[in-house]
Each structure stands twice: as structure tokens, then as C-alpha cells.
């Protein structure tokens, strides 16, 4: 019977949960916004991990995103050390933070669909009367 999850996926899921707590509790930089970890992709040899984040709030502009990525990049070594203490893994991957724009794109597409449906209804109501 084949495994449903590979080892790298299990480690990535655990890292996602641990990092969410560690970033919230351990990173004391006041410039850091509300960061949400959307995914963690771990390489097969467990040497690198891409950590995908989103930044919530009204300051969802490119400068704020860049600043948050820089702060997390500077704290990557510290976070890796904390992960080493909390996870039962021999080697902890190097952390590389990337912005995940899929949430924003999904919201924009949903808004476009809702607007198109509303315009459709308006046209149907106008043609019936």
C-alpha cells in the first residue's frame, strides 16, 4: 500500500504549523505585519524549504510585502534554530521566504465573477420588464 503523504510533505506540514506559532510569539519586530503561512515546500534532500506567506491587512502593498520578507529573511536562522528545538528531525532545512499572491488573485477573481453575475442579473431584469 502506497503512502498518501511523502516524508517531505509531512515535514512541510509540521513546519508550517510550528512556524505559524514561532513567528507570532518569537519575532518581536514591530514592523512585521500579520503574516500567514500558506504553504511550505521542502526539497527531497531536506536541505531547503520554501515558505510561502501572505500579509494580511490594509497595507497589502509591494513595499510592505518586501519589508515583511526582509524581516523574515533576517530571522530565518533564528527560526531554524527554534524549529530544531521543537521538531524531531535530524536536519532542519534552510528557510527561504516567498510571497504567495494566490490568495489576493483568488479574491480579485471572485470579485470579477460576482460583478459579472450582478451585471447579468441586471440585464436579465431589464429585458424582462
Swiss-Prot record:
Subcellular location: Cytoplasm
Cysteine pairs bridged by disulfides in the record: none
GO terms under biological process: maturation of SSU-rRNA
One cellular component term from this protein's GO annotations in UniProt: cytosol
The entry's keywords: Cytoplasm, Ribosome biogenesis
Highest taxon in the source lineage: Bacteria
InterPro entries noted in UniProt: KH_dom-like_a/b, RbfA, RbfA_dom_sf, Ribosome-bd_factorA_CS
SUPFAM superfamilies attached to this UniProt entry: Ribosome-binding factor A, RbfA (SSF89919)
An MF annotation (GO) of this entry: ribosomal small subunit binding
Pfam short name (any one): RBFA
Family statement: Belongs to the RbfA family.
Task of the protein: One of several proteins that assist in the late maturation steps of the functional core of the 30S ribosomal subunit. Associates with free 30S ribosomal subunits (but not with 30S subunits that are part of 70S ribosomes or polysomes). Required for efficient processing of 16S rRNA. May interact with the 5'-terminal helix region of 16S rRNA.
Assembly with partners or alone: Monomer. Binds 30S ribosomal subunits, but not 50S ribosomal subunits or 70S ribosomes.
Name listed for the protein in its UniProt record: Ribosome-binding factor A
Originating species: Ectopseudomonas mendocina (strain ymp)
Record gene name: rbfA
Amino acid at each position: 500500500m502506497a503512502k498518501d503523504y511523502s516524508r517531505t510533505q509531512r515535514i512541510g506540514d509540521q513546519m508550517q504549523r510550528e512556524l505559524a506559532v514561532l513567528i507570532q510569539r518569537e519575532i518581536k519586530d514591530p514592523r512585521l505585519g500579520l503574516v500567514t503561512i500558506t504553504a511550505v515546500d521542502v526539497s527531497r534532500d531536506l536541505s531547503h524549504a520554501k515558505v510561502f506567506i501572505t500579509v494580511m491587512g490594509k497595507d497589502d502593498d509591494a513595499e510592505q510585502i518586501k519589508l515583511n520578507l526582509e524581516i523574515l529573511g533576517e530571522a530565518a536562522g533564528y527560526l531554524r534554530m527554534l524549529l530544531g528545538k521543537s521538531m524531531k528531525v535530524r536536519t532542519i532545512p534552510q528557510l527561504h521566504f516567498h510571497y504567495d499572491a494566490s490568495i489576493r488573485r483568488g479574491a480579485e477573481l471572485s470579485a470579477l465573477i460576482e460583478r459579472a453575475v450582478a451585471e447579468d442579473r441586471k440585464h436579465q431584469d431589464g429585458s424582462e420588464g
